[in-house]
Amino acid sequence: GCGGMVRSNEEWLTSAHGQVLAGKPIVEIIKIADSDPEPLPQGSRPLSGIRALDLTRILAGPIAARTLAENGADVLMVTADGLPQIKEHVMDTNHGKRSCYLDLKSSEDAARLKQLVRGADVFSQGYRPGMLSSLGFGPEELAEIRPGLISLSISCFGADGPFSHRGGWEQVAQTVTGICHDGGIDDRPALLPAAACDYTTGYLGAYGVLLALARRAREGGSYHVRVSLCQSGMLIYRQGKASFAQPDMDLSNSEIEALSVTSNTDAGPLRHLGPVLQLSETAPHWTRPTPTLGGDVAEWLDVEGAANAAE
């Protein structure tokens, strides 16, 4: 389980852990090993030819990998039969990916994952700090397996500080950073009606991966990108609060429809929000619908197959 005490933003910033996070960048990009420079692969899209392993679930991590997929990356979502999933979140956050089952506690499946790592550019995970290191898949171990790999770590409390070992979700981040404290009425704490920390963290994670890939292309190296829900909560809090006196800013049905796309999934046609970011020459889009969990083989597409999928 996980949880957190309701704090004001001032209480959070004066706490030991809040002070640690306040002294760090929102997106940490740490060079952890040397390797030769690797120019980005040639292709028609920003991330054509980039391969990403996505070992995340629920929201923030899947959003990060989904963002890579909408820009042309071959994203393979790795999960295990029996791991808890939320169907609605799976349908919303995995457009453009493939999905396979691997049990990391199985020696055979762990060996298969290591083989996938050797062909990967990005490895994204959302376990508590140190969890995957105990299984031989920490950032440093991964950099030895595949020099030049970009590791993305997503957590609730970040990698350093007295709370770094704790797990947590969107609600925990809102609760401890002051969002919940200030969001209620009549001094009663209340959560935001949306997963703002999760989505913000996912997009920041993808942004960090892009910066790390650019650095790898220029100077080489393996990189560890770190983002956290609490850092995102602190960022959101700093933007200030809207006044109840301000007019309603909800989108109309016609505006929502204009921003939506339809995917033909195994569960049937799915109408959902399209990519948020728009580029004039390389428009982000997904070439695959949300996959069936475990419905793909644990292997990379060949160059020709990846290129066709990226178009």
Say what each PLM segment does.
Residues S134-D182:
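Rossmann-fold NAD(P)-binding glycine/threonine-rich loop
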Residues L53, R98-E144:
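A structured beta-alpha segment of the ubiquitous adenosine-cofactor-binding alpha/beta core
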Residues T177-P193:
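The feature captures the short pre-catalytic strand/loop hairpin that immediately precedes
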Residues C100, A111, Q171-T175, Y203, ...:
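Feature representing long, continuous alpha-helical segments
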Residues A73, M77-L104:
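Glycine-rich phosphate-binding loop and adjoining beta1-alpha1-beta2 segment
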Residues D103, V122, P162, R166-W169, ...:
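Hydrophobic alpha-helical scaffolding
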Residues G72, G96-K97, A120, W169:
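Short, well-ordered alpha-helix to beta-strand connector turns
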Residues G1-G82, K114, R118-G119, I145-G158, ...:
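Acyl-CoA thioester-binding alpha/beta core of soluble enzymes
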